[in-house]
Swiss-Prot record:
Positions of the record's site feature: Reactive bond: 129-130
Gene assigned in the entry: eco
Function: General inhibitor of family S1 serine proteases.
Keywords per UniProt: Disulfide bond, Periplasm, Protease inhibitor, Serine protease inhibitor, Signal
Subcellular location(s) per record: Periplasm
Higher taxonomy: Bacteria, Pseudomonadati, Pseudomonadota, Gammaproteobacteria, Alteromonadales
Signal peptide: 1-25
Cysteines paired by S-S bonds: 95-132
InterPro entries given in the database record: Ecotin_sf (IPR036198), Prot_inh_ecotin (IPR005658), Prot_inh_ecotin_gammaproteobac (IPR023084)
Protein name: Ecotin
Length: 183
Protein backbone atom coordinates (compact mmCIF):
# COMPACT_ATOMS: atom_id res chain seq x y z
CA UNK A 1 0.00 0.00 0.00
CA UNK A 2 1.37 3.43 -0.89
CA UNK A 3 2.07 6.06 1.75
CA UNK A 4 -0.58 8.58 0.51
CA UNK A 5 -3.28 5.87 0.64
CA UNK A 6 -2.17 4.86 4.12
CA UNK A 7 -2.28 8.49 5.34
CA UNK A 8 -5.78 8.91 3.88
CA UNK A 9 -7.00 5.76 5.68
CA UNK A 10 -5.60 7.01 9.00
CA UNK A 11 -6.93 10.56 8.56
CA UNK A 12 -10.63 9.61 8.38
CA UNK A 13 -10.87 7.91 11.82
CA UNK A 14 -8.67 10.60 13.35
CA UNK A 15 -10.91 13.38 12.01
CA UNK A 16 -14.03 11.57 13.24
CA UNK A 17 -12.50 11.21 16.71
CA UNK A 18 -11.48 14.84 16.93
CA UNK A 19 -14.84 16.19 15.76
CA UNK A 20 -17.14 13.93 17.77
CA UNK A 21 -18.29 13.63 21.41
CA UNK A 22 -16.28 15.90 23.74
CA UNK A 23 -16.28 13.78 26.88
CA UNK A 24 -14.56 10.49 27.23
CA UNK A 25 -14.44 7.72 29.77
CA UNK A 26 -11.02 7.84 31.31
CA UNK A 27 -9.22 6.74 34.35
CA UNK A 28 -7.42 9.92 35.28
CA UNK A 29 -3.85 9.48 36.46
CA UNK A 30 -3.62 8.36 40.04
CA UNK A 31 -2.76 11.36 42.26
CA UNK A 32 0.41 9.60 43.44
CA UNK A 33 1.56 9.23 39.84
CA UNK A 34 1.54 5.45 40.15
CA UNK A 35 -0.23 3.27 37.63
CA UNK A 36 -2.88 2.21 40.15
CA UNK A 37 -6.68 2.20 40.12
CA UNK A 38 -7.97 5.64 40.94
CA UNK A 39 -11.07 4.69 42.94
CA UNK A 40 -10.56 2.28 45.82
CA UNK A 41 -13.32 -0.23 46.53
CA UNK A 42 -14.24 -2.20 49.62
CA UNK A 43 -17.24 -4.39 50.30
CA UNK A 44 -18.68 -5.95 53.45
CA UNK A 45 -21.64 -8.17 54.18
CA UNK A 46 -23.51 -8.78 57.44
CA UNK A 47 -20.99 -11.47 58.51
CA UNK A 48 -17.74 -9.53 58.02
CA UNK A 49 -18.97 -5.98 58.69
CA UNK A 50 -16.57 -3.79 60.65
CA UNK A 51 -17.39 -0.08 60.87
CA UNK A 52 -14.75 2.09 59.21
CA UNK A 53 -14.26 5.64 60.52
CA UNK A 54 -15.13 7.37 57.23
CA UNK A 55 -18.43 5.49 56.78
CA UNK A 56 -19.49 4.60 60.35
CA UNK A 57 -22.59 6.81 60.03
CA UNK A 58 -24.02 4.57 57.27
CA UNK A 59 -26.17 1.59 58.31
CA UNK A 60 -24.59 -1.85 58.59
CA UNK A 61 -25.53 -4.21 55.74
CA UNK A 62 -28.49 -6.47 56.49
CA UNK A 63 -28.40 -10.23 55.97
CA UNK A 64 -28.32 -10.99 52.23
CA UNK A 65 -26.96 -7.53 51.37
CA UNK A 66 -23.44 -6.31 50.60
CA UNK A 67 -22.22 -2.79 51.35
CA UNK A 68 -19.95 -1.45 48.56
CA UNK A 69 -17.85 1.62 49.39
CA UNK A 70 -16.19 3.66 46.64
CA UNK A 71 -13.51 6.02 47.93
CA UNK A 72 -12.45 8.71 45.48
CA UNK A 73 -9.06 10.40 45.85
CA UNK A 74 -8.88 14.19 45.87
CA UNK A 75 -8.28 15.75 42.44
CA UNK A 76 -7.32 19.27 41.47
CA UNK A 77 -10.33 19.98 39.19
CA UNK A 78 -13.06 17.68 40.50
CA UNK A 79 -15.74 19.66 38.62
CA UNK A 80 -14.30 18.26 35.35
CA UNK A 81 -15.00 14.65 36.41
CA UNK A 82 -18.08 12.43 36.84
CA UNK A 83 -18.49 8.85 38.04
CA UNK A 84 -20.83 6.52 36.12
CA UNK A 85 -22.32 3.63 38.09
CA UNK A 86 -23.96 0.48 36.68
CA UNK A 87 -25.41 -2.34 38.75
CA UNK A 88 -26.01 -5.85 37.50
CA UNK A 89 -24.54 -9.34 37.24
CA UNK A 90 -22.11 -11.16 34.97
CA UNK A 91 -24.14 -13.88 33.27
CA UNK A 92 -23.79 -16.42 30.50
CA UNK A 93 -25.93 -14.99 27.67
CA UNK A 94 -26.82 -15.85 24.09
CA UNK A 95 -27.09 -13.42 21.16
CA UNK A 96 -30.20 -11.71 22.57
CA UNK A 97 -30.15 -8.43 24.49
CA UNK A 98 -30.73 -9.19 28.16
CA UNK A 99 -31.69 -7.02 31.11
CA UNK A 100 -32.40 -7.36 34.81
CA UNK A 101 -35.20 -5.99 36.96
CA UNK A 102 -34.25 -3.94 39.99
CA UNK A 103 -34.82 -0.47 41.35
CA UNK A 104 -32.00 1.80 42.46
CA UNK A 105 -33.14 3.97 45.39
CA UNK A 106 -31.38 7.02 46.79
CA UNK A 107 -31.70 7.12 50.58
CA UNK A 108 -30.45 9.52 53.26
CA UNK A 109 -28.66 8.77 56.53
CA UNK A 110 -30.97 10.14 59.22
CA UNK A 111 -29.39 12.98 61.19
CA UNK A 112 -26.43 13.28 58.83
CA UNK A 113 -27.99 14.15 55.48
CA UNK A 114 -25.56 11.92 53.55
CA UNK A 115 -26.92 10.01 50.56
CA UNK A 116 -26.43 6.34 49.84
CA UNK A 117 -27.92 4.02 47.23
CA UNK A 118 -29.72 0.71 47.57
CA UNK A 119 -31.13 -2.04 45.36
CA UNK A 120 -33.32 -4.40 47.41
CA UNK A 121 -33.61 -7.22 44.89
CA UNK A 122 -32.51 -8.12 41.38
CA UNK A 123 -34.41 -10.56 39.17
CA UNK A 124 -34.39 -11.70 35.56
CA UNK A 125 -35.62 -8.98 33.27
CA UNK A 126 -36.65 -8.52 29.67
CA UNK A 127 -34.85 -10.10 26.75
CA UNK A 128 -35.20 -10.06 23.00
CA UNK A 129 -36.28 -13.38 21.50
CA UNK A 130 -34.03 -13.97 18.49
CA UNK A 131 -33.16 -17.52 17.52
CA UNK A 132 -29.65 -18.17 18.83
CA UNK A 133 -27.44 -21.21 18.70
CA UNK A 134 -26.63 -22.76 22.07
CA UNK A 135 -22.91 -22.68 21.22
CA UNK A 136 -22.96 -18.89 20.92
CA UNK A 137 -23.20 -18.22 24.68
CA UNK A 138 -20.68 -15.85 26.28
CA UNK A 139 -20.17 -14.04 29.57
CA UNK A 140 -21.49 -10.48 29.64
CA UNK A 141 -22.43 -7.85 32.20
CA UNK A 142 -26.24 -7.60 32.37
CA UNK A 143 -27.53 -4.55 34.21
CA UNK A 144 -30.66 -3.16 35.79
CA UNK A 145 -32.27 -0.29 33.85
CA UNK A 146 -31.21 2.41 36.31
CA UNK A 147 -27.85 4.03 35.69
CA UNK A 148 -26.37 6.64 37.94
CA UNK A 149 -23.99 9.45 37.08
CA UNK A 150 -22.58 11.32 40.05
CA UNK A 151 -20.49 14.45 40.25
CA UNK A 152 -16.99 13.61 41.34
CA UNK A 153 -16.71 14.53 45.02
CA UNK A 154 -13.86 13.10 47.09
CA UNK A 155 -15.09 14.53 50.41
CA UNK A 156 -17.33 11.55 51.21
CA UNK A 157 -17.26 7.93 49.97
CA UNK A 158 -20.06 6.68 47.72
CA UNK A 159 -21.95 3.89 49.52
CA UNK A 160 -24.15 1.24 47.87
CA UNK A 161 -26.17 -1.65 49.31
CA UNK A 162 -26.75 -4.48 46.82
CA UNK A 163 -28.09 -8.02 47.10
CA UNK A 164 -25.45 -10.76 47.35
CA UNK A 165 -24.41 -11.82 43.85
CA UNK A 166 -24.89 -8.34 42.39
CA UNK A 167 -21.97 -6.40 40.94
CA UNK A 168 -21.26 -2.70 40.96
CA UNK A 169 -19.41 -1.45 37.90
CA UNK A 170 -18.09 2.08 37.56
CA UNK A 171 -15.95 4.34 35.44
CA UNK A 172 -14.73 7.91 35.61
CA UNK A 173 -15.58 10.49 32.96
CA UNK A 174 -13.57 13.62 32.29
CA UNK A 175 -14.73 16.60 30.25
CA UNK A 176 -12.03 17.35 27.67
CA UNK A 177 -13.57 20.42 26.13
CA UNK A 178 -14.30 23.97 27.20
CA UNK A 179 -17.82 25.36 27.49
CA UNK A 180 -19.55 26.54 24.33
CA UNK A 181 -21.94 29.51 24.52
CA UNK A 182 -25.24 30.36 22.88
CA UNK A 183 -26.43 33.96 23.04
Amino acid sequence: MKLPQLCHLAAVPLAFTLLSFNASAVSPPHPTGLDAPMISVSSMNANNYAPVETVKMFPAPKKGMVQHILTLPKLENETDYMVEIQIGQTQLVDCNKHGLNGQLKELTVEGWGYNYYQVDEISEGPSTMMACFELAKKEAFVQIPDELTLRYDSRLPKVFYLPEGAELRFRTWKADSTYQYSK
